[in-house]
């Protein structure tokens, strides 16, 4: 049976791919992005390959690779591709598998099918990645509420950005979720700086099955 952690976020461009790379590296696991929309500027799998330190065979191929950089349902329509949820079964991996969603939890895949519906079917523990910037309390609590409404297990919330103790504490308290830690924005960002920062902010025990 696949032992997986799903990584979702409160919005796009939060830092979910960087977090996924750090987590996959910390766990010495595998990584999988079910649906990649947009290929010309590189893929999230390419980023994780560069930043995680994992061998290529542990960056598992996407179920769908869409040319158009857009929400998956729109990219699929433009590319004349039909996304079949039956093909979104997590691939086998003999290590912990980090699964990265697209954008936020309620991103549509096809018709009325949302990423949240796929996650609900899998029932893997899910990490919410959130900004620390203004507005994150509302976005984070809405995401937590949407996960709970679908009975998706929540492992905890991880923040990315400058420290905002009050916002981070408030989200964890009101949302009733574990506060896993905070990853700072990194400059330079490479495999070495990410591994060091991730190990300082999180431990493998935070993500134990």
Curated annotation (Swiss-Prot):
Its Enzyme Commission number(s) read 6.3.3.3
Chain residues that bind Mg(2+): 17, 100
Cite the active-site annotation: 33
Q: Does the keyword Ubl conjugation apply?
A: no
PANTHER family reported for this sequence: ATP-DEPENDENT DETHIOBIOTIN SYNTHETASE BIOD 2, DETHIOBIOTIN SYNTHETASE
Q: What class of enzyme is it?
A: ligase
Q: Which HAMAP family match?
A: BioD
* GO CC terms: cytosol
Q: Which UniProt keywords apply?
A: ATP-binding, Biotin biosynthesis, Cytoplasm, Ligase, Magnesium, Metal-binding, Nucleotide-binding
Q: Which cofactor does it need?
A: Mg(2+)
What is the superkingdom listed in this entry's lineage? Bacteria
Its biological purpose is as follows: Catalyzes a mechanistically unusual reaction, the ATP-dependent insertion of CO2 between the N7 and N8 nitrogen atoms of 7,8-diaminopelargonic acid (DAPA, also called 7,8-diammoniononanoate) to form a ureido ring.
Annotated organism of origin: Rhizorhabdus wittichii (strain DSM 6014 / CCUG 31198 / JCM 15750 / NBRC 105917 / EY 4224 / RW1)
Gene Ontology molecular function terms on file: ATP binding; dethiobiotin synthase activity; magnesium ion binding
GO biological process assignments: biotin biosynthetic process
- Where does this one sit in the cell? Cytoplasm
Q: Which pathway is this protein engaged in?
A: Cofactor biosynthesis; biotin biosynthesis; biotin from 7,8-diaminononanoate: step 1/2
The record describes its quaternary structure and partners as: Homodimer.
Q: Does the keyword Plastid apply?
A: no
* Residues bound to ATP: 13-18, 100-103, 184-186
**Family the UniProt entry places it in:** Belongs to the dethiobiotin synthetase family.
Predominantly, its location class is cytoplasm
User: What's the protein called, per UniProt?
Assistant: ATP-dependent dethiobiotin synthetase BioD
What catalytic activity is recorded? (7R,8S)-7,8-diammoniononanoate + CO2 + ATP = (4R,5S)-dethiobiotin + ADP + phosphate + 3 H(+)
């Amino acid at each position: 049976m696949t032992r997986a952690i799903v990584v979702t976020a409160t919005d796009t461009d939060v830092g979910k791919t960087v977090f996924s790379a750090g987590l996959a590296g910390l766990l010495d696991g595998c990584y999988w992005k079910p649906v990649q929309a947009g290929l010309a500027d590189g893929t999230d799998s390419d980023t994780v390959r560069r930043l995680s330190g994992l061998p290529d065979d542990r960056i598992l191929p996407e179920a769908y690779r869409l040319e158009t950089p857009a929400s998956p349902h729109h990219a699929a329509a433009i590319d004349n591709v039909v996304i079949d949820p039956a093909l979104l079964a997590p691939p086998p991996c003999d290590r912990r598998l980090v699964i990265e969603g697209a954008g936020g939890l309620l991103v549509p895949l096809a018709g009325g099918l949302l990423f949240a519906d796929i996650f609900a079917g899998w029932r893997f523990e899910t990490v919410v990645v959130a900004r620390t910037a203004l507005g994150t309390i509302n976005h984070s609590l809405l995401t937590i509420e949407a996960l709970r409404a679908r009975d998706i297990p929540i492992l905890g919330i991880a923040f990315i950005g400058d420290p905002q103790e009050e916002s981070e504490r408030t989200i964890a308290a009101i949302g009733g979720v574990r506060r896993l830690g905070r990853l700072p924005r990194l400059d330079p960002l490479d495999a070495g700086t990410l591994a060091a920062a991730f190990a300082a902010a999180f431990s493998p025990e935070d993500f134990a099955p």
